[in-house]
């Protein structure tokens, strides 16, 4: 900028219009604080790395220390640059103060103008010619050049103090290949049994693997209910018996019960004997004993005699037309119908014998 083309009062006014040296001094203090903090971090990191090297030895330790050592160098470099900028800010404040002291002040310039005006007004018969020339010389030569020179020096020092060295960012401590592979967690690891990392596959293969990985999620969601049903059937099969081909191995509850079963819970009518011949405890499930059918007894225990005798044996002493056992409302002790002889009833000893057989049968089942 052509400072010599401007009057001294304009140059001085431009210089005085700034914020002064206070911002530069504050910036210098901030850079000094940052430099001290970086130095402390560098010292602490160096101590930590030394302790790590003593506690951890081997190839991995050497690689870790070699990767972390540049961090210490970067901290030290940044601290040095912070100190340099603090010095530059301090020098800028000093340059401003020097420029303000060198340039003519506005009151001095104003006094020159006032003196010039008075001498010109009182210049009768040329008596003030020499004082007027000296006043003009002081303004145009000394003040003008002094103000311009002060601004030129201040501009040059400002250019030097604002020229900062570029601070390079800290380099990554990871290898370039490792940092690139970690960006994709799916393809960053090689598959088991493969000698080539997945990250080095062609782009087409990588894209295909990505599509397969995206499709595996919905397929797992679709097959999850089927897996639950399969596990349920496996549990039922394990409980029902070890050999699925053997239909008579065991039965779980009433599953697999024969349609010809006489068990009441399976849809049967219960024992063929009437209610008058057996006690309530002798019916399956009516007493405190464990409910069991003859089929279950044959499958689990040794074969036993059936608890109910054939109906033909009970009716051997009765003539044709006699009512079967248990047909009447009162059991075997009831009177016969119109087609039988008057007063003909079922033999009482037979009913007592059937009751004792049933009780013995259920007692054996209770022991089980």
UniProtKB/Swiss-Prot annotation:
GO terms for cellular component: cell surface; extracellular region; plasma membrane. The keyword Secreted applies. It comes from the Bacteria. The keyword Membrane applies. Residues 255-280, 312-368 are annotated as: Disordered. One of its GO terms (biological process) is response to host immune response. Residues 354-368 have a biased composition (Acidic residues). Residues 312-327 have a biased composition (Low complexity). Its main location: secreted. It is found in: Secreted, Cell wall; Cell membrane; Cell surface. PPE68 is recognized by antigen-specific T-cell lines from HLA-heterogeneous subjects. Peptide P9 is an immunodominant and HLA-DR promiscuous peptide of PPE68 (amino acids 121-145), and may be exploited as a peptide-based vaccine candidate against tuberculosis and other mycobacterial diseases. Plays a major role in RD1-associated pathogenesis, and may contribute to the establishment and maintenance of M.tuberculosis infection. Together with PE35, stimulates the secretion of IL-10 and MCP-1 from human macrophages, via the interaction with human Toll-like receptor 2 (TLR2). Stimulates high levels of gamma interferon secretion in peripheral blood mononuclear cells isolated from tuberculosis patients, as well as from healthy tuberculin purified protein derivative-positive donors. Does not interfere with the secretion and immunogenicity of EsxA (ESAT-6) and EsxB (CFP-10). Homodimer. Interacts with PE35. PE35/PPE68 complex interacts with human TLR2. Interacts in vitro with EspG1, EccA1 and EsxB. PANTHER family: GLUTAMINE-RICH PROTEIN 2. Belongs to the mycobacterial PPE family. This is PPE family immunomodulator PPE68. It comes from Mycobacterium tuberculosis (strain ATCC 25618 / H37Rv).
